[in-house]
Amino acid sequence: MSFNHHTIEELHELLVAKDISAVELTKATLEDIKAREEAVGSFITIACEAALKQAAALDAKGIDPDNVMSGIPLAVKDNISTKGILTTAASKMLYNYEPIFDATAVANAYDKDMIVIGKTNMDEFAMGGSTETSYFKKTKNAWDHSRVPGGSSGGSATAVASGQVRLSLGSDTGGSIRQPAAFNGVVGLKPTYGAVSRYGLIAFGSSLDQIGPFAPTVRENAQLLSVIAGSDRKDSTSAPVQIADYTSKIGQDIKGMKIALPKEYLGEGIDPKIKETILAAAQHFEKLGAIIEEVSLPHSKYGVAVYYIIASSEASSNLQRFDGIRYGFRAADAKSLEDIYVKTRSQGFGDEVKRRIMLGTFSLSSGYYDAYFKKAGQVRTLIIQDFEKVFADYDLILGPTAPTAAFELDTLNHDPVAMYLADILTIPVNLAGLPAISIPAGFADGLPVGLQLIGPKYSEEVIYQVAAAFEATTDYHKQQPMIFGGDR
């Protein structure tokens, strides 16, 4: 029996009433994963034994009636550390790495008696927008298996969209939660920088990375964020802000709210069908009582260039730790210490990772630091100031999550610039450290289209409020791909 059409609250009621046990739910989830895995390839590791052991222990202890997450399976992106479960970052460099500790986000999930069911596929070290740079496999879009799921958290998005799991965790450095959420027709949120601890997240761009939730609905997404968020002494960038319940504003009306629609987000390079969908969504918000007005974010056009200088520079520093000495892959044919470093990194990293290491090393070099890295930091400040000016007068910003719907496999992975431009609408949010959500807003040629809502720092409750108002008065989130029993 499958329970993948049940909401978290419905599953909780079944568990509390003992209509099902945690072991039965875990076994059913494992069956859902296996039944769909060959078609979509969401997972790198399926933690059958560990998950069933945890579920049995929970049944012995008893389900907490006051904890809606007790016994709920959770898929985790494979760059988030899980003690005793392979954590590869989808790289040959870490193909055999088992952490001896849990990431704080995972530890928080365990504290709520959630069950880690497996580790999801991703772009190698989270560097990519299609989940095609993984060392292990290419994940497929849940709606069309000839298309990409987005990236870098493609496995986490597809696992939810295809009905393998109800909840998953991803990470977002330049759009890596929101873009795959849009491509797969699910809800994905990138929290405020510092709202969720980065401890245990394998670092890509340390000033940009954030762990965040995927779910089929806005409420379930907010429920998962309530579990993983919070201040953490182990992360020096963790914010001293504690919000106990991110669902608190869901269900409240949005009459009188002012929502900005940047003209740059619907300009050149945006698929006309995407633009049409977003404008229709804006009209829908007006019917709900919100005030929609056009604004300008003039420096957003520089976001991609700024991001790839800053992110690559930070990556070139972060990835220095992977040298074949302490853990992970080591080249077998090395004859000296220098040989170990050179051959291990040459053989262990994929092409996209090596490209970004070289770009970052160049940007940080003494002759080019001022011209590139320093200048990028200055433009980043201008992008932040653009957002601050808008949020002085508006509650949220509305726009598309991605300029197109999901593209075909093997079309952009050989064109780095085109792939980078696919993140043009999500990148500015990371540069400014803001929260943003992608929710299903319609379809273009049978493929899901994502609507992005951006808020000022620590406005996740308001973002969820507005997103839920849209969701409650539309049915896009209810439509499912054929692999999940839908008719598309």
UniProtKB/Swiss-Prot annotation:
Question: What S-S linkages are listed for this chain?
Answer: none
Q: Name one Pfam family in it.
A: Amidase
Among PROSITE patterns, the record links this protein to: AMIDASES
Task: Return one Gene Ontology term, BP aspect.
Answer: translation
One GO MF term on file is: glutaminyl-tRNA synthase (glutamine-hydrolyzing) activity
> Catalytic residues?
K77 (charge relay system), S152 (charge relay system), S176 (acyl-ester intermediate)
InterPro entries attached to this UniProt entry: Amidase (IPR000120), Amidase_CS (IPR020556), Amidase_dom (IPR023631), AS_sf (IPR036928), GatA (IPR004412)
Give GO cellular component annotations, separated by semicolons: glutamyl-tRNA(Gln) amidotransferase complex
Q: Which reaction(s) are listed as its catalytic activity?
A: L-glutamyl-tRNA(Gln) + L-glutamine + ATP + H2O = L-glutaminyl-tRNA(Gln) + L-glutamate + ADP + phosphate + H(+)
Task: Give the top-level enzyme category.
Answer: ligase
Q: What is its EC number?
A: 6.3.5.7
Q: Which domain of life is it from?
A: Bacteria
Record's keyword terms, sorted: ATP-binding, Ligase, Nucleotide-binding, Protein biosynthesis
> Which Gene3D superfamilies does the entry link to?
Amidase signature (AS) domain
Q: According to its UniProt record, which protein family does this protein belong to?
A: Belongs to the amidase family. GatA subfamily.
Biological role:
Allows the formation of correctly charged Gln-tRNA(Gln) through the transamidation of misacylated Glu-tRNA(Gln) in organisms which lack glutaminyl-tRNA synthetase. The reaction takes place in the presence of glutamine and ATP through an activated gamma-phospho-Glu-tRNA(Gln).
Q: How does it assemble?
A: Heterotrimer of A, B and C subunits.
Official protein name in the record: Glutamyl-tRNA(Gln) amidotransferase subunit A
Q: Which organism is it from?
A: Streptococcus equi subsp. zooepidemicus (strain H70)
Upper classification of the source organism reads: Bacteria, Bacillati, Bacillota, Bacilli, Lactobacillales
